[in-house]
Amino acid sequence: KIALSTPVELENDFPITFQLQNSAPIVERVDFKPSFTENIYFVYLNKKQSSKASIEKYLNRQQDISEVVSEIETITKLTIETNNFPVFSKAIEKHEAIMSAVLEMETVKQKYFNDFNGTVKSLGAWGGDFVMVLSEENPKEYFKQKGFETILTYEEMIL
């Protein structure tokens, strides 16, 4: 089980990074103001899943993830620092592929949106309520045709 040694505020009005070091939460505020916010969307899937159940399932596997953690840290740093949309998109795709392998689950794009021309990133419990969508073109019509009506721009989401 993951037990935090100190309470941590998990809701914030600003971007953060979060990690555990020796069961202690490390929360850092980050400056995330990419020049390509018009290419970032959030789609509500209405497929609520339990993060707790996903975490427990993962923890029962007893995998050594030190290499994965290092790779994820590198990707996180890149996504925070880059102002290049294709670089950001590729980094997000790499993160999603790594998590897919670790969790032994197909990505949300593979499962629901394999014909989408862009990036789809699971948020929260994999395949849960929201996904982040990265696209050169407005993807709202695509997702509406798939039956998803709630599509928010980056600006709408961060209000």
Segments the model singles out, each with a brief description of its role:
Residues I2-A125, M132-L159:
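C-terminal nucleotide
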